[in-house]
Amino acid sequence: MEEFRRSYNRLCEESGAEPQEAVLQQLHQLPKGGLDLTTQSLTVETCRALGKLLHKETLLKELVLSDCMLSEEGSTLLFQGLCANTSVQHLDLKGNNLRATGAEALGKLLRQNKSIQSLTLEWNNLGTWEDAFATFCGGLAANSALRQLDLRNNQISHKGAEELALALKGNTTLQQLDLRWNNIGLLGGRALVNCLPSNRTLWKLDLAGNNIPGDILRAVEQAMDHNQDRLTAFRENQARTKILSKEVQHLQEEKSKQFLDLMETIDKQREEMARDSRASAVRVGQLQEALNERQSIINALKAKLQMTEAALALSEQKVRDLGELLVAGDQERQSLSQRHEKERKLERQEAADRESKLLRDLSAASEKNLLLRSQVDELERKARSQQEQLFLTKQELTNTSAELKIRAIQAEERLDVEKRRAKQNMEDLEKLHSKEVDHMTRHLEESERAMQERVQRLEALRLSLEEELSRMKAAVLSERGQAEEELIKARNQARLEEQHRLAHLEEKIRLLAQARDEAQGTCVQQKQMVAESQARVSQLNLQMEGQQRRLEELQQELINKDQEKVAEVARVRVELQEQMGRMQADLVAQEALREKVAALERQMKVIGSEHREALLDRESENASLREKLRLKEAEISRIRDEEAQRASFLQNAVLAYVQGSPLRALSPPK
């Protein structure tokens, strides 16, 4: 406030006037936020300086200028400074004898100032000049900040009340109006009553001491009560609305916090899922490689086992054939020995007879001996040819086994090619899956910018990712199944080809064995071959048992790996289900918040509808009261007209009586 005082001194010096000591003293004792110049006679220069100071002053809240006897020029200068002021809220101009110029300046002040809320104009003469007061009322109608107006003792007539009523129809902020001790009268009271239905903010109107009938005062009181009830309801509704808005804002903040927490949780879960998926992919790749290695080992062992089984079956068939040959040779030898014994007996019996014939038959026997020798030579040649044919058959069998091995190796190579192709397909599918995951991630980042649809889009994205993952898994499984089916088909085809070739070879061996039966000289060799075959069969049985044990161990390891893989998949599935459960719980909490907000909105709508119904009831009640008031006013006007007619009749009668009385003739002239 010291700055305010220095500015006042400077402005007075610039204008060439002496600062008023009383004003300086008040400025020195100036309380915080207020300036009280009550009963101080302010000069025009002081008013000019104060007007310039008030034009820029931002700390002054209250200005009291009561009983200062302001001149018209001084009041105009003060009001011009207050027009641009934005801090003064209470202005007291009591007892300043403001007239036409002051009323017009006040009208301009009310039209331009947006901060004054309380204006005291008691004991002035604003209503004496109707045009100036009309200007004041126009400023009041345009004002949107004034809450309290005191116009007591301002000589306001019924015309001024009519102008004031027009101003009240356009004003939407004035709440208290004091019009006591004026000259409003019946017509002014009616004008004010008629304007009250259009004004719903004025809840206090004092009209005492204005010669207004009691019914009009009661109507004014009813209107004020109605506005006060409306104001109370409005304040209650505003308080409820503020509480509800705070609650809604709090809920929105909580919702936003929860949503941010949910988004952070989802990001963390997404990162964890990405890490888990990468680790799972690495683990699956390692397991797949190990499985492929084990599968290749198993396939090699299976191929060896099949070859061993084929060799074993061939050896067993050879053993059976050789056994049959031995049995047939033994039977033939026994039959030959029996027949030889019979022949010897016959020869002994016929020895005597032969002795005589030997000499005769010697020449014939020698010839027969030569013939038999030639037959023996022929049989030996046949045996050698059979041995050569057997050697060729063995060589063909060796070539066939080598060809079978080559075909098995080719089948294994084709199997490896199919595995590599399946692995390449898996890698391509993983790359495609990673690209699709990147695309969906970018799509998720774009969709996160929309606050209202963020949860729904996130849910849809999660579902689509799960569906895509399930589809990719199904595709991988189907391709793996197809690869396994192709592998099985290739194995079956190779096995069928081997079986056909083995059957063909067995047929050849059977034919060769039947041809070999005719050779008697190979029995010892066949026995040796049987012994060797039995020893080889025992060795092959031992090797087969070892291979079976190895195969069982590999199968057990494969089962353990499958169990570990299933356990890992189950653990990942449980984690995903837990994450989905937490997300569903968050969604349920958000849905509860939405329901709570919807309930609050419904409650606000119910309160608004009740308020509207109450307003409609009050308006209907006001309409009925206005109708009753109109009827009462009509009746009162009729009674007043009758009373006026009676009074005029009585006055005429009295005048006629006075004019016709003898006392008038005796009265001296004036």
Curated annotation (Swiss-Prot):
Phosphorylated by NEK2 during misosis, phosphorylation reduces centrosomal localization which subsequently leads to centrosome separation. Keywords: Coiled coil, Cytoplasm, Cytoskeleton, Leucine-rich repeat, Phosphoprotein, Repeat. The modification Phosphoserine is found at residue 661. Disulfide bonds: none annotated. Pfam families: LRR_6 (PF13516). Homomer. Interacts with CROCC/rootletin and CEP250. Interacts with CEP44. This is Leucine-rich repeat-containing protein 45.
